[in-house]
Amino acid sequence: MSSRYGRALTIFSPDGHLLQVEYAQEAVRKGSTAVGVRGANCVVLGVEKSSVSEMQEDRTVRKISMLDRHVALAFAGLTADARILINRGQVECQSHRLNFENQVTLEYITRYLAQLKQKYTQCNGRRPFGISCLIGGIDADGSARLFHTEPSGIFHEYKATATGRWANTVREFFEKAYSDHEVTTKCDAIKLAMRALLEVTQMSQMRLEVAVLENGKPMKMLDSVVISEIVKIVQNEKELQAKAHKMKR
């Protein structure tokens, strides 16, 4: 009897669960960790990239993509599913510019993708998208926005959040480390995102992808040299804080 509920997408289990949606959320929990930080005038997205073969082109393994000049999406979960949502999101952004002659708002494109995900939880012959998305960018009024969508179709806005394998650990870190007066510059937001990823990433296996969006500027991907320099700064600050804490004792 339980297998029937597990295989059926549109049938609730006796305890009120849609098991296929929960299985999709489990696929997200097995994905690479992705973080997002909203600064005063920027948004930073960071992802822990999976290891790839030495023969594979590194540029083809991307966890962060542009939906429009002012919107970027990072994800955790199934890459093939993400490609479909990214394509749909890009087309919707272009269509909105063509029809209304202005850019989409962050809430609009987030709601569009969330509604698409929700439809796939009610249709026979389809399965839910096995990805969770962090959607960040700058609205036309210059305000930075950061949203998080789940496979079920729900979405929320955050100051800082995470998804993927170590999402709970990173969220706990953000709750302790994030404050508006400490994330006033682009550099502050980048360092906080990097600190969050370093909480769950081993230095010897570190492969990070970091994108920055600012008002009036295209999305900028940080190269490996810049990332390494910021990691050193973050590590030094962490050591100094640890020493200061010991001295207080």
From Swiss-Prot:
One Pfam family recorded for the sequence: Proteasome
Expression by tissue: Testis specific.
First-listed, main subcellular location of the protein, grouped into a coarse class: cytoplasm
Compartment(s) where it occurs, according to its Swiss-Prot or TrEMBL record: Cytoplasm; Nucleus
Impact upon substituting R29P: In strain: CPA-46
GO annotation terms (biological process): proteasome-mediated ubiquitin-dependent protein catabolic process
Domain of life of the native organism: Eukaryota
Protein keywords: Cytoplasm, Nucleus, Proteasome
Ranges in coiled-coil conformation: none
Keyword Cytoplasm attributed: yes
Any one of the GO CC terms: proteasome core complex, alpha-subunit complex
Quaternary assembly: The 26S proteasome consists of a 20S proteasome core and two 19S regulatory subunits. The 20S proteasome core is composed of 28 subunits that are arranged in four stacked rings, resulting in a barrel-shaped structure. The two end rings are each formed by seven alpha subunits, and the two central rings are each formed by seven beta subunits. The catalytic chamber with the active sites is on the inside of the barrel.
PANTHER family to which the protein is assigned, alphabetical: PROTEASOME SUBUNIT ALPHA/BETA
Protein task: The proteasome is a multicatalytic proteinase complex which is characterized by its ability to cleave peptides with Arg, Phe, Tyr, Leu, and Glu adjacent to the leaving group at neutral or slightly basic pH. The proteasome has an ATP-dependent proteolytic activity.
Entry's family note: Belongs to the peptidase T1A family.
Protein name stated in the entry: Proteasome subunit alpha type-7-1A
